[in-house]
From Swiss-Prot:
Gene3D superfamilies: Anticodon-binding domain (3.40.50.800), Bira Bifunctional Protein, Domain 2 (3.30.930.10). Keywords: Aminoacyl-tRNA synthetase, ATP-binding, Cytoplasm, Ligase, Nucleotide-binding, Protein biosynthesis. The gene is hisS. This is Histidine--tRNA ligase. GO terms for cellular component: cytoplasm. One of its GO terms (biological process) is histidyl-tRNA aminoacylation. It comes from Corynebacterium urealyticum (strain ATCC 43042 / DSM 7109). Homodimer. It catalyses: tRNA(His) + L-histidine + ATP = L-histidyl-tRNA(His) + AMP + diphosphate + H(+). PANTHER family: HISTIDINE--TRNA LIGASE, MITOCHONDRIAL-RELATED (PTHR43707:SF1), HISTIDYL-TRNA SYNTHETASE (PTHR43707). InterPro entries: aa-tRNA-synth_II, aa-tRNA-synth_II/BPL/LPL, Anticodon-bd, Anticodon-bd_dom_sf, His-tRNA-ligase, HisRS-like_core, HisRS/HisZ, HisRS_anticodon.
Amino acid sequence: MTNSGEKKFQPLHAPKGIPDYVPPQSSEFLAVRTAFLDAAHNAGYEHIELPVFEDTSLFARGVGESTDVVSKEMYTFADRGGRSVTLRPEGTAGVMRAVIQHNLDRGQLPAKLAYHGPFFRYERPQAGRFRQLQQVGVEAIGVDDPALDAEVIALADRCFRSIGLDGFRLELTSLGDSTDRPAYRAKLQEFLATLPLDEETQRRAELNPLRVLDDKRPQMQEMLADAPLMKDHLSDSSREHFETVTGLLEDMGVEYTINPRMVRGLDYYTKTCFEFVHDGLGAQSGIGGGGRYDGLMAQLGGQDLSGIGFGLGVDRALLALEAEGKTASTGRRVDVFGIPMGDAAKRHMAALINELRAAGVAADMAYGNRGLKGAMKAANRAHAQLAVVIGDQELEAGTVAVKDLQLGEQHDVAVADLVTHIRRQLA
């Protein structure tokens, strides 16, 4: 309590592990997300908007109960009706649910969908790892064709290059299919039985031994050095599929390395699996990834159709750009900045700014009765190309002063001709 008897409140902060994006970084965030989505839309992917929470059973069935995501990291709670719901930890399961519910799998195939938004995982916050992560993702559903795998991977590569990122690398592997997995699973469990595993790791080995390979602890990686590899247990069809994918990537000029030990953290992946990594991010080096998920739709109650997709981290991409000493190109915030000198001028300026906006010109104006010098500084901070000034002299003459802030040139323009003049200068 304060001396006056009023309660003293603690400062409010965002929840732990959840970043705010405020200007100017928010402009970079928007630039990265927009660049990713533009690349997806240019490749024929249509936008899909999904709820941020779903029935918990969707993720338990779709992502896999043995995964860390489901067993440890989900934000799950009961709503007022007693139903168990979960803030979405990833995007693919929700997209597949929507495809089944709205019969998108019964139209033109492949169904090519793009999405963006926040996803939630209860992880230990650290550099590059947040509890609310921002992603852009795509899913291509309904066609089992290695050319589609190559398209999706090349699209992800193009997304990162579109923001000026170049210090990343692409890692690929094949996880085989339902005919390859049983023999490999048995071989891997046989190997794991010889290791001194802790109780939690033993549980994983019984439920899904591939999850053990995803253990990043140094002592576990050392013990797993001689573990059998999936690449040595691929069927002829899985091997041919993977070789076709890599050949197509080479034709497209997409560089890659094969990582036979890659295991992504979700159970639904089959055949092609990939990850983009950036060494400038330290331990949290993954900036995006994905893979094929044949069988997931049937597992969720739909048709037995294949699919492939990716999720790209907007947060991680921003950190990777920072590690390279770069920023995302945000463009000019406004084209025109209005500077009224006096109350009468302010009324006229407000009307002119509204007219410019209606004509599609990005425009803002100075508020608060600041002087000309301060208003010009505000125009420069807004990265405006043109400043429009109205004072007593301009009011009397029915004109405005238009100044090019890059060239330093200034012209008097009749109010009636302002929109046409501005458009001509911005063209």
